Amino acid sequence: MFTINAEVRKEQGKGASRRLRAANKFPAIIYGGSEAPIAIELDHDKVMNMQAKAEFYSEVLTLVVDGKEVKVKAQAVQRHAFKPKLTHIDFIRA
């Protein structure tokens, strides 16, 4: 089982996302269920290592957001066109 630490995003938009990526992080979102969507930021290198395993896409993951655990599944993963980088992930609540 994968556990990923995440932070709630304070800024949103193209410029904020570019600043995150320059700081070796990337934006993501958690949605689904009866709760409101949560915009988060993740550490790129840690998630990149985890997503190399096939189980990342099929198992329920645990995101720790501000000390609270959220069970999710990876719904959509966006990658850079030619660099080995993740640019965004959509998580759906499990």
From Swiss-Prot:
Task: State the protein's purpose.
Answer: This is one of the proteins that binds to the 5S RNA in the ribosome where it forms part of the central protuberance.
Instruction: Give GO terms: molecular function aspect only.
Output: 5S rRNA binding; structural constituent of ribosome
Q: Which GO terms describe its biological process?
A: translation
Swiss-Prot/TrEMBL keywords = Ribonucleoprotein, Ribosomal protein, RNA-binding, rRNA-binding
One Pfam short name: Ribosomal_L25p
Specify the protein name. Answer: Large ribosomal subunit protein bL25
- The organism is Salmonella arizonae (strain ATCC BAA-731 / CDC346-86 / RSK2980)
Q: Which GO terms describe its cellular component?
A: cytosolic large ribosomal subunit
Q: How does it assemble?
A: Part of the 50S ribosomal subunit; part of the 5S rRNA/L5/L18/L25 subcomplex. Contacts the 5S rRNA. Binds to the 5S rRNA independently of L5 and L18.
Family according to the record: Belongs to the bacterial ribosomal protein bL25 family.
